[in-house]
Protein backbone atom coordinates (compact mmCIF):
# COMPACT_ATOMS: atom_id res chain seq x y z
CA UNK A 1 0.00 0.00 0.00
CA UNK A 2 2.67 2.52 1.03
CA UNK A 3 4.99 1.63 -1.88
CA UNK A 4 2.15 1.97 -4.39
CA UNK A 5 1.34 5.42 -3.03
CA UNK A 6 4.98 6.56 -2.97
CA UNK A 7 5.47 5.49 -6.58
CA UNK A 8 2.34 7.40 -7.62
CA UNK A 9 3.27 10.76 -6.07
CA UNK A 10 5.77 12.33 -3.68
CA UNK A 11 4.78 11.77 -0.04
CA UNK A 12 5.96 14.22 2.60
CA UNK A 13 5.34 15.57 6.07
CA UNK A 14 5.97 19.01 7.56
CA UNK A 15 8.52 19.05 10.34
CA UNK A 16 8.76 21.38 13.33
CA UNK A 17 10.77 24.37 12.11
CA UNK A 18 11.65 25.21 15.73
CA UNK A 19 13.45 21.87 16.22
CA UNK A 20 16.36 22.61 13.83
CA UNK A 21 20.00 22.48 14.94
CA UNK A 22 23.25 22.78 13.02
CA UNK A 23 26.53 20.97 12.54
CA UNK A 24 28.33 19.94 15.74
CA UNK A 25 25.26 20.65 17.89
CA UNK A 26 24.09 17.84 20.17
CA UNK A 27 20.92 15.86 19.58
CA UNK A 28 19.06 15.55 22.88
CA UNK A 29 17.43 12.14 23.33
CA UNK A 30 13.64 12.52 23.75
CA UNK A 31 12.45 11.30 27.15
CA UNK A 32 9.70 9.05 25.74
CA UNK A 33 11.90 7.02 23.37
CA UNK A 34 14.17 4.00 23.68
CA UNK A 35 14.85 3.60 19.94
CA UNK A 36 16.55 6.67 18.48
CA UNK A 37 17.70 6.58 14.87
CA UNK A 38 19.40 8.72 12.21
CA UNK A 39 18.49 9.18 8.56
CA UNK A 40 21.00 9.97 5.82
CA UNK A 41 19.32 12.64 3.72
CA UNK A 42 20.09 15.83 1.88
CA UNK A 43 17.80 18.68 1.01
CA UNK A 44 17.24 21.99 -0.70
CA UNK A 45 16.25 25.44 0.48
CA UNK A 46 13.74 27.47 -1.47
CA UNK A 47 15.14 30.84 -2.58
CA UNK A 48 12.28 32.28 -4.64
CA UNK A 49 8.60 32.22 -3.75
CA UNK A 50 6.20 30.45 -6.05
CA UNK A 51 2.89 28.68 -6.39
CA UNK A 52 1.88 26.04 -8.94
CA UNK A 53 5.53 25.79 -10.01
CA UNK A 54 6.11 23.56 -13.03
CA UNK A 55 8.69 20.80 -12.90
CA UNK A 56 10.67 22.62 -15.61
CA UNK A 57 10.78 25.84 -13.56
CA UNK A 58 11.36 24.21 -10.17
CA UNK A 59 15.16 24.37 -10.20
CA UNK A 60 14.99 28.17 -10.54
CA UNK A 61 13.40 28.26 -7.07
CA UNK A 62 16.23 26.35 -5.33
CA UNK A 63 18.62 28.54 -3.35
CA UNK A 64 20.99 25.74 -2.40
CA UNK A 65 21.58 22.29 -0.95
CA UNK A 66 22.72 20.94 2.40
CA UNK A 67 22.89 17.69 4.39
CA UNK A 68 19.94 16.65 6.56
CA UNK A 69 19.86 14.19 9.47
CA UNK A 70 16.19 13.44 10.16
CA UNK A 71 16.50 12.09 13.72
CA UNK A 72 13.64 9.71 14.50
CA UNK A 73 12.22 8.11 17.64
CA UNK A 74 11.33 4.79 16.01
CA UNK A 75 9.26 3.36 18.86
CA UNK A 76 7.03 6.46 18.92
CA UNK A 77 6.90 6.54 15.13
CA UNK A 78 5.86 2.89 15.00
CA UNK A 79 2.94 3.51 17.35
CA UNK A 80 1.80 6.58 15.39
CA UNK A 81 1.93 5.23 11.86
CA UNK A 82 -1.00 2.90 12.50
CA UNK A 83 -3.17 6.02 12.62
CA UNK A 84 -2.26 6.74 8.96
CA UNK A 85 -1.72 10.44 9.64
CA UNK A 86 2.06 10.43 9.37
CA UNK A 87 4.72 10.85 12.03
CA UNK A 88 4.15 13.11 15.03
CA UNK A 89 6.29 12.63 18.15
CA UNK A 90 8.37 10.15 16.19
CA UNK A 91 9.97 13.10 14.41
CA UNK A 92 8.73 16.14 16.34
CA UNK A 93 10.96 16.91 19.32
CA UNK A 94 13.67 19.44 20.13
CA UNK A 95 16.86 18.89 18.07
CA UNK A 96 15.18 16.39 15.70
CA UNK A 97 16.20 18.18 12.48
CA UNK A 98 19.94 18.51 11.96
CA UNK A 99 21.13 20.52 8.95
CA UNK A 100 24.52 21.65 7.71
CA UNK A 101 27.44 22.08 7.60
CA UNK A 102 26.93 24.67 4.84
CA UNK A 103 24.69 25.72 1.99
CA UNK A 104 26.00 24.94 -1.49
CA UNK A 105 24.45 26.86 -4.37
CA UNK A 106 23.30 25.06 -7.53
CA UNK A 107 26.05 26.65 -9.65
CA UNK A 108 28.71 25.39 -7.21
CA UNK A 109 27.25 21.88 -7.04
CA UNK A 110 26.75 21.04 -10.70
CA UNK A 111 24.70 17.86 -11.21
CA UNK A 112 22.88 17.37 -7.90
CA UNK A 113 21.87 13.81 -8.75
CA UNK A 114 25.27 12.14 -8.80
CA UNK A 115 26.74 12.74 -5.35
CA UNK A 116 28.04 9.91 -3.17
CA UNK A 117 26.61 9.80 0.35
CA UNK A 118 28.01 8.01 3.41
CA UNK A 119 26.92 7.61 7.03
CA UNK A 120 29.32 6.72 9.83
CA UNK A 121 28.54 6.00 13.47
CA UNK A 122 31.48 6.40 15.87
CA UNK A 123 33.85 6.50 12.90
CA UNK A 124 32.65 3.20 11.41
CA UNK A 125 30.92 3.22 8.03
CA UNK A 126 27.30 2.20 8.43
CA UNK A 127 25.95 2.73 4.91
CA UNK A 128 26.34 4.56 1.64
CA UNK A 129 24.25 5.67 -1.28
CA UNK A 130 23.97 8.28 -4.00
CA UNK A 131 21.74 11.31 -4.49
CA UNK A 132 20.68 9.81 -7.82
CA UNK A 133 18.73 7.13 -5.93
CA UNK A 134 15.89 9.54 -5.13
CA UNK A 135 12.58 8.20 -6.41
CA UNK A 136 11.38 11.78 -6.93
CA UNK A 137 13.78 14.64 -7.76
CA UNK A 138 13.49 17.99 -6.01
CA UNK A 139 11.99 19.29 -9.27
CA UNK A 140 9.20 16.72 -8.88
CA UNK A 141 8.75 17.49 -5.19
CA UNK A 142 8.61 21.27 -5.68
CA UNK A 143 6.04 20.88 -8.48
CA UNK A 144 3.93 18.60 -6.27
CA UNK A 145 4.15 20.56 -3.01
CA UNK A 146 3.50 23.93 -4.69
CA UNK A 147 0.15 22.87 -6.14
CA UNK A 148 -2.27 25.53 -4.82
CA UNK A 149 0.27 26.31 -2.06
CA UNK A 150 2.88 29.07 -2.02
CA UNK A 151 6.44 28.01 -1.24
CA UNK A 152 8.35 30.75 0.57
CA UNK A 153 12.07 31.59 0.68
CA UNK A 154 13.73 29.70 3.51
CA UNK A 155 11.50 26.63 3.32
CA UNK A 156 13.40 23.35 3.32
CA UNK A 157 12.61 20.13 1.46
CA UNK A 158 14.31 16.86 2.45
CA UNK A 159 15.12 14.02 0.08
CA UNK A 160 13.89 11.10 2.13
CA UNK A 161 16.28 8.50 3.47
CA UNK A 162 18.85 6.97 1.16
CA UNK A 163 18.91 3.15 1.10
CA UNK A 164 21.20 1.81 3.86
CA UNK A 165 20.97 5.25 5.45
CA UNK A 166 19.23 4.44 8.72
CA UNK A 167 19.54 2.03 11.62
CA UNK A 168 15.95 0.88 11.11
CA UNK A 169 16.99 -1.12 8.06
CA UNK A 170 19.30 -3.26 10.22
CA UNK A 171 17.46 -2.82 13.53
CA UNK A 172 20.57 -1.14 14.95
CA UNK A 173 19.70 1.98 16.88
CA UNK A 174 21.70 4.77 18.47
CA UNK A 175 23.15 4.79 21.97
CA UNK A 176 23.89 7.79 24.19
CA UNK A 177 27.16 9.53 23.22
CA UNK A 178 27.18 8.06 19.71
CA UNK A 179 28.64 10.38 17.07
CA UNK A 180 26.91 10.38 13.68
CA UNK A 181 28.62 11.69 10.55
CA UNK A 182 26.69 12.17 7.33
CA UNK A 183 28.85 12.97 4.32
CA UNK A 184 27.70 14.12 0.90
CA UNK A 185 30.23 14.76 -1.86
CA UNK A 186 30.73 18.47 -2.68
CA UNK A 187 28.75 19.50 0.42
CA UNK A 188 30.79 18.21 3.35
CA UNK A 189 30.29 16.34 6.63
CA UNK A 190 27.44 16.89 9.09
CA UNK A 191 28.60 15.71 12.53
CA UNK A 192 26.27 15.26 15.50
CA UNK A 193 26.60 13.74 18.97
CA UNK A 194 23.66 12.15 20.78
CA UNK A 195 23.27 13.12 24.44
CA UNK A 196 20.82 11.71 26.97
CA UNK A 197 19.86 13.91 29.94
Please tell me what each predicted stretch does.
Residues 74-197:
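Catalytic-pocket segment enriched in acidic/His residues
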Residues 1-125, 195-197:
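Active-site microenvironments in enzyme catalytic cores
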Amino acid sequence: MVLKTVRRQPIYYKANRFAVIGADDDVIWPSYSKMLDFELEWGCYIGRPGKDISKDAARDHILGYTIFNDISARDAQGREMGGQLGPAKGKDFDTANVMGPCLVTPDELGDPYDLDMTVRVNGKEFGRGNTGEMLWTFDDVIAHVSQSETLHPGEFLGSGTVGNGSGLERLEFLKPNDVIELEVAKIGVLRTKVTKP
